[in-house]
């Protein structure tokens, strides 16, 4: 029996595992290895921070959900992949080391939030990128009496060599891994403090390591700047954060921004497990270069999906799901199941929600990749879409078989 390991438990990995098992059935054993038995619907973690959702509402127990679909599950932290001998090494919850051989592996363990690169993070930093981060921020916001808030992202340490075997325009250079959560939090906080009657006591500054929202068209960026102007939000470009202090943040050039609360999408680097793997599996940033079918350019039994793939820029949930689906479809063909393989075409697709004010901004944009689509639409119906998508993900336990049909809402 062909053995397929899927590493990870978020959008890319779960999409790959569920899709592959649905396609190949008993033709392959599919096993997921993830560092936790729980997976979370991360697009709603900002909602936890502002108190409209609880973390437990967003939790999927993979040890129950995956076996229900005929997929094996193993809790364990991946330490490295030996691509030459087709082995994965991981640490079990009890601390013991284990190894597992594979015929094929789909790598979806994401990147690394490099908080260690920002001085003062442990004492003064806040974020919404992990469940525990969102909960900590929620507690801070509840007790906040007013002052300065800075929201932004750290630098993205993108790999460049070797390059993936895809059209060059599909992989633009990015200063930030993804600024969608920054945009969303800036809108959410306006609604949050308006509800608390504190707008006159709070001053928000949004910062970016490069040009803010550079993955959108100039017209969309102008629209965002106009929204910020109306909301009284200050925008600072080219601010590469180096340190968080009690009442300010500092960039690499010594510039400062007032900040009594700093909300940060931390610097983004390659996953340590991938950097520890077979050297020619990854690029110089620790990401896996692939072709358009998500197959490694060096090892044809290795697939990479989501943030672990060097091709996915920015590091976006929509792209993770697309890559997971394509990898599964391509592998199904190799396992003897004729399957149409979707074409990879990168597009920025996201919804920046503002639940307290009852609207969201729906974004669809491919201009960064040479396309002509540029939509940034604020509307009440988009808030409803985000609510429904959250419910759909939780209802399916991450098995979003209809996602590609729903994404064009």
Swiss-Prot record:
Domain of life: Archaea
Location, primary (coarse class): membrane
Location(s) in or outside the cell: Membrane
pH dependence (UniProt free text): Optimum pH is about 6.
Activation/inhibition comment: Inhibited by the quinone analog 2-heptyl-4-hydroxyquinolone N-oxide (HQNO). Inactivated by iodoacetamide treatment. Inhibited by KCN.
Annotated keywords: FAD, Flavoprotein, Membrane, Nucleotide-binding, Oxidoreductase, Quinone
Cofactor(s) it depends on: FAD
Temperature behavior of the protein's activity: Optimum temperature is above 70 degrees Celsius.
Cofactor note: Binds 1 FAD per subunit.
Signal peptide (UniProt feature, chain positions): none
Cellular component terms per the entry's GO annotation: membrane
Leading EC class: oxidoreductase
Pfam families: Pyr_redox_2
Catalytic activity annotation: n a quinone + n hydrogen sulfide + n H(+) = polysulfur(n-2) + n a quinol
Residues forming the catalytic site: 178, 350
GO molecular function annotations of the record: nucleotide binding; quinone binding; sulfide:quinone oxidoreductase activity
Membrane topology: Peripheral membrane protein
Function: Catalyzes the oxidation of sulfides, such as hydrogen sulfide, with the help of a quinone. Has the highest activity with caldariella quinone and decylubiquinone, and lower activity with naphtoquinones. Consecutive reaction cycles lead to the accumulation of a polysulfide product on the active site Cys residues; these products are released when they exceed a critical length, typically as cyclooctasulfur.
Similarity field: Belongs to the SQRD family.
The protein's assembly and partners: Monomer.
Protein name (Swiss-Prot/TrEMBL): Sulfide-quinone reductase
């Amino acid at each position: 029996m062909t053995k397929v390991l899927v590493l990870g438990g978020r959008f890319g990995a779960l999409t790959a595992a569920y899709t592959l098992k649905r396609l190949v059935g008993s033709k392959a054993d599919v096993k997921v290895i993830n560092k936790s038995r729980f997976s979370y619907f991360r697009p709603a973690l900002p909602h936890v921070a502002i108190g409209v959702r609880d973390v437990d509402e967003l939790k999927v127990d993979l040890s129950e959900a995956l076996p229900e679909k005929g997929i094996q599950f193993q809790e364990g932290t991946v330490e490295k992949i030996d691509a030459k001998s087709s082995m994965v090494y991981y640490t079990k919850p009890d601390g013991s080391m284990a190894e597992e051989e594979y015929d094929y592996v789909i790598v979806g363990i994401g990147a690394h939030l490099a908080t260690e690169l920002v001085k003062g993070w442990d004492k003064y930093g806040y974020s919404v990128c992990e469940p525990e981060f969102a909960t900590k921020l929620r507690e801070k916001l509840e007790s906040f009496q007013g002052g300065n808030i800075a929201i932004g992202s750290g630098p993205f340490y993108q790999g460049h060599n070797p390059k993936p075997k895809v059209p060059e325009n599909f992989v633009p250079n990015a200063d930030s891994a993804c600024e969608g959560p920054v945009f969303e939090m800036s809108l959410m906080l306006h609604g949050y403090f308006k509800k608390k009657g504190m707008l006159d006591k709070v001053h928000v500054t949004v910062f970016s390591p490069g040009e803010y929202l550079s993955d959108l068209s100039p017209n969309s960026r102008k629209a965002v700047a106009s929204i910020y102007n109306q909301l009284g939000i200050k925008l600072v470009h080219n601010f590469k954060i180096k340190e968080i202090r009690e009442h300010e943040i500092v960039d690499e050039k010594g510039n400062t921004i007032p900040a009594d609360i700093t909300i940060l999408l931390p610097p983004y680097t390659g996953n340590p497990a991938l950097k520890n793997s077979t050297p020619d599996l990854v690029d110089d940033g620790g990401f896996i270069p692939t072709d358009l079918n998500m197959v490694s350019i060096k090892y044809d039994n290795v697939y990479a999906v989501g943030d672990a793939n060097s091709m996915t820029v920015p590091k976006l949930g929509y792209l993770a799901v697309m890559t997971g689906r394509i990898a599964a479809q391509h592998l199904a063909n190799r396992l003897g199941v004729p399957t149409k393989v979707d074409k990879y075409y990168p597009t920025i697709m996201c919804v920046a929600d503002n639940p307290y004010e009852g609207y969201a901004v729906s974004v669809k944009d491919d201009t960064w990749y040479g396309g002509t689509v540029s939509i940034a639409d604020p509307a009440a119906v988009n808030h409803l879409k985000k609510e429904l998508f959250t419910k759909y993900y939780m209802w399916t336990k991450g098995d979003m078989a209809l996602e590609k049909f729903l994404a064009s809402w």
